[in-house]
């Protein structure tokens, strides 16, 4: 059995400026996106349609806005609507934490639609470009969660070699290190599968559909090891909010994949 190291959340202090590990994981995520998306635009079908490195940089700008705005609004609406209805100004206090992946996904989808419209490109062409690059950012974020000692898992069998006690949880119960599970599933595994899948010619929209299905299924599985949010607990059918949000995500992914294949 292991004990969470309780890392200092501040990686570096430069005078009055404190640089947090979680912020650095975002920088790593953005850097990986630039690198991987730049590789993708060098190959078919994006090379033939005139994609450039500058397009990728602009795409990142749109994506960052989508992640921040969508992630925050998703947390507010999906997880704590009552609280923020009573404290509306706190919606803007992003530095206090509170982001939701599913909201961030919707924000990015909207941002990609706006980018596609301003550049005269097909929306699904844009989402197909970025889909295989996203899991590395998710992996980076989960490392940030682990360093911060947050989003710990449900109680685990003490005999499990990697069961971990989180002192910050207020108990000595051994738990699953769920951020590391999500790092492996939604990050590394999903990246490898999508990157290999996208290397072959696919109908426009199928890579995006594969991402929705892949993430939804893997997140659904990971949620069984993650402690539900204390203010929500488990919902209908013993499922967490994260799992319920994955259900329409997987359904949309399957529908998109089938529709794109028939339309090709």
Curated annotation (Swiss-Prot):
It is a multi-pass membrane protein. This is Phosphatidylglycerol--prolipoprotein diacylglyceryl transferase. Coiled coil: none annotated. Its main location: membrane. Belongs to the Lgt family. The lineage of its organism: Bacteria, Pseudomonadati, Pseudomonadota, Betaproteobacteria, Burkholderiales. A 1,2-diacyl-sn-glycero-3-phospho-(1'-sn-glycerol) binds at residue 142. GO terms for biological process: lipoprotein biosynthetic process. Signal peptide: none annotated. Keywords: Cell inner membrane, Cell membrane, Membrane, Transferase, Transmembrane, Transmembrane helix. The chain crosses the membrane at residues 17-37, 59-79, 95-115, 205-225, 241-261. GO terms for cellular component: plasma membrane. Catalyzes the transfer of the diacylglyceryl group from phosphatidylglycerol to the sulfhydryl group of the N-terminal cysteine of a prolipoprotein, the first step in the formation of mature lipoproteins. Its EC number is 2.5.1.145. It holds the Pfam family LGT. Pathway: Protein modification; lipoprotein biosynthesis (diacylglyceryl transfer). It is found in: Cell inner membrane. GO terms for molecular function: phosphatidylglycerol-prolipoprotein diacylglyceryl transferase activity.
């Amino acid at each position: 059995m292991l004990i969470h190291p309780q890392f200092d959340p501040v990686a570096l202090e430069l005078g009055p400026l404190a640089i947090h590990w979680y912020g650095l994981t975002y920088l790593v995520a953005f850097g990986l996106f630039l690198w991987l998306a730049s590789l993708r635009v060098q190959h078919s079908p994006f090379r033939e349609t005139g994609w450039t490195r500058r397009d990728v940089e602009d795409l990142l700008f749109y994506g960052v806005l989508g992640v921040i705005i969508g992630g925050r609004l998703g947390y507010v609406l999906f997880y704590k609507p009552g609280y923020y209805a009573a404290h509306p100004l706190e919606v803007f206090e992003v530095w206090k934490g509170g982001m939701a992946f599913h909201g961030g996904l919707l924000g990015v989808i909207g941002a990609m639609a706006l980018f596609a419209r301003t550049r005269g490109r097909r929306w699904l062409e844009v989402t197909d470009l970025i889909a295989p690059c996203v899991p590395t950012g998710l992996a980076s974020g989960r490392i940030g969660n682990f360093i911060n000692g947050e989003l710990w898992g449900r109680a685990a069998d003490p005999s499990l070699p990697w069961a971990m006690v989180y002192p910050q949880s207020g108990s000595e119960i051994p738990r699953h290190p769920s951020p590391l599970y999500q790092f492996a599933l939604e990050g590394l595994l999903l990246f490898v599968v999508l990157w290999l899948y996208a290397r072959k010619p696919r109908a426009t929209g199928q890579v995006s559909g594969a991402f929705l299905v892949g993430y939804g299924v893997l997140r659904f599985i990971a949620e069984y090891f993650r402690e539900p949010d204390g203010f929500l607990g488990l919902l209908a059918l013993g499922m967490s909010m994260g799992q319920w949000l994955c259900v329409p995500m997987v359904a949309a992914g399957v529908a998109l994949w089938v529709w794109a294949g028939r339309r090709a």
